[in-house]
Amino acid sequence: MSEQQPLPTLPMWRVDHIEPSPEMLALRANGPIHRVRFPSGHEGWWVTGYDEAKAVLSDAAFRPAGMPPAAFTPDSVILGSPGWLVSHEGREHARLRAIVAPAFSDRRVKLLVQQVEAIAAHLFETLAAQPQPADLRRHLSFPLPAMVISALMGVLYEDHAFFAGLSDEVMTHQHESGPRSASRLAWEELRAYIRGKMRDKRQDPDDNLLTDLLAAVDQGKASEEEAVGLAAGMLVAGHESTVAQIEFGLLAMFRHPQQRERLVGDPSLVDKAVEEILRMYPPGAGWDGIMRYPRTDVTIAGEHIPAESKVLVGLPATSFDPHHFDDPEIFDIERQEKPHLAFSYGPHACIGVALARLELKVVFGSIFQRLPALRLAVAPEQLKLRKEIITGGFEQFPVLW
């Protein structure tokens, strides 16, 4: 009798932070769903097929990531926190999402275009004025989304370093391993910050998200605690993911100079370039996906999944599904566009899609014109990935120009 093979273990890190994991590609080639072992030691399933991932993400038979069964509940104050969208589902989730959705609509985001461009231009100038090598993370990828989300929400630019640091701490160890005490404290501090800003907005309302949330409270659409949680969640989500995508996108352009030259030669390709960056390096590219929990026994691609199992939807892995993308391992900014799952899918799809795309288009539409010789100051493998944070990104991103 042959010995049972050990289960593949997650996470499966990229090679030099850029190339897809060979283990992931080999596993993905064997089908769209796989039995795996998670860092916590629990066993479960990893969905790597594009169609199968969409099916899970849109199926009400699965609980969202923020509503795990008791056996898997991590020690985190965020789970179950009022207004934290991933901790709500069904009508409650739809009610809360409808409150913040207008702030991230195409109309509201279009009003921010000039402001985002001005913020980016200022940060490009600040970066260019630094002695070389300089940390692009400190001077561009970290502050830009923080300053943009502060404009959308109606909080002071001067506060961006404060709440960006808190959002960083909140997202630390929100996967399955590691201590969470600092994360809990940061979440409560962030909520206290939001409460104070909401009190200020009572006296000085304006066209921004905090004012919208106060109106929702006054109209009985949300409790004050739900409004605070929604605002805090938007600050975190509106900042963390884009930081990593700017950094991964630049890495991809450095790795593929011909693609960079195409973009510089034809700036109209920026929309396609951003979509290819999103496909290859979706939010959480440093991790393996987002969790779901079936309420009852289900079947995925012929695989029986018992109720309350861990089912990780591998958003980054779905980008390499050859049944959906031609030559998926090739980074090609002129790729024939097909929908990807960078922003998830279904009722819990990312609400800030338009804003994230705008930020990335502004950065990649002008950074190589502003800094034509921009390049890494170290080898890619020397960059230190923030493995403890689910959105990924790097501790520092030293560049020359």
Swiss-Prot record:
Heme binds at C350. Pfam families: p450 (PF00067). It is an enzyme of class 1 (oxidoreductase). Its EC number is 1.14.14.-. It comes from the Bacteria. Its cofactor is heme. One of its GO terms (molecular function) is oxidoreductase activity, acting on paired donors, with incorporation or reduction of molecular oxygen. Keywords: Heme, Iron, Metal-binding, Monooxygenase, Oxidoreductase. Belongs to the cytochrome P450 family. PANTHER family: CYTOCHROME P450 BJ-1 (PTHR46696:SF5), P450, PUTATIVE (EUROFUNG)-RELATED (PTHR46696). Cytochromes P450 are a group of heme-thiolate monooxygenases. They oxidize a variety of structurally unrelated compounds, including steroids, fatty acids, and xenobiotics. This is Cytochrome P450 BJ-1. The gene is cyp112.
